[in-house]
């Protein structure tokens, strides 16, 4: 299931990388664009890594606040 969700994202990222710089700043040859692909993918991977490193901490905070809310929860007696 995850693979199905990530494939469109991967296609969009590859299209963005292959698009290269804007035409006003465009390189005269396509070889320069192909040389930049590994660096662009590495930067993208590093950004993803940084984003996913924060997930455990955010989950821990969420679960802690949820547990605190459950501790303070009282069922009203009718």
Curated annotation (Swiss-Prot):
Subcellular location: Secreted
MF terms in GO: fatty acid binding; phospholipase inhibitor activity
One GO BP: lipoprotein metabolic process
GO annotations of cellular component type: high-density lipoprotein particle; very-low-density lipoprotein particle
Main location: secreted
InterPro entries found in the cross-reference section: ApoC-I
N-terminal signal peptide: 1-26
UniProt keyword annotations, A-Z: Lipid transport, Secreted, Signal, Transport, VLDL
Family affiliation: Belongs to the apolipoprotein C1 family.
Function: Inhibitor of lipoprotein binding to the low density lipoprotein (LDL) receptor, LDL receptor-related protein, and very low density lipoprotein (VLDL) receptor. Associates with high density lipoproteins (HDL) and the triacylglycerol-rich lipoproteins in the plasma and makes up about 10% of the protein of the VLDL and 2% of that of HDL. Appears to interfere directly with fatty acid uptake and is also the major plasma inhibitor of cholesteryl ester transfer protein (CETP). Binds free fatty acids and reduces their intracellular esterification.
Protein name: Apolipoprotein C-I
Organism: Lynx pardinus (Iberian lynx)
